[in-house]
Amino acid sequence: MTEQEPASKPIVFTTHARQRMRERGAREDDVREAIRIGQRETAHRGLVLYRLNVEFNREWDGRYYGVQQVAPVVAEEKDRFVVVTVYTFYFQEGEKA
């Protein structure tokens, strides 16, 4: 039996992850995309961190940013991905065009 490719595994979100997404301004579609095509890094306790920079071009927390980095921390199970938490980072601070 072969291990499923990332594109075919379902992605589930813990309550904690959904709360952090709301607090940190991450959209579910961007988190899913980060897991599918983002840069993969080993994290603590057997978890995996994915990173994906997405075009943002709007305000967050009173400042305007061009790029948002979405970084979900994931438990990769045999048949699914479980999003444990989500970090976000903002870049290219500037002014609205």
Tell where the protein language model's regions lie, with residue ranges:
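Ribonuclease/tRNase effector modules and their secretory precursors
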Residues: 1-97
